[in-house]
Amino acid sequence: LRPEEIASRIPDGATVALAASGIFLEADAILEAVERRFLETGHPRDLTVVHALGIGDGADSGLNRLAYEGLVRKVVGGHWSWSPRMQKLARENLIAAYSFPGGAISSLLREIGAGRPGLITHVGLGTFADPRVDGGRCNSRADEELVELCEFLCVLEGRERHP
């Protein structure tokens, strides 16, 4: 498929997961096609973008291609440094912005790809990602609870063990 065809298949309100690091493995031709389609037609709009690592060159490529009010509604990212325009949207409260550990996001994407319902991990407890702290929220527009604290009862050798 050509980048334009891929961009045309992204519906309004879709969740798009991106996998790259800086400019390495960046699907810039596809991101450019999505940007061009939005600027020409106003679609797709209200996307949720998920990325584990920083994507782009810090100027025009990567997540910066998606940094338009209306194109993106929510970003869940592990590293925002390479996308100053997306950072600006988050700072101005024009998108819901969340940040979680990059490894946890990568593992979550693997779980989703395998058809499993989510990720259970201790990573992030006691940090900004902990639901008892900020729950990964970076601004006031980020009003959803994307993570939750779970407690488990372990039964080993017929006896209950509490962590």
Task: Give residue ranges: language-model regions.
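Conserved alpha/beta enzyme-core scaffold
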Residues: 1-163
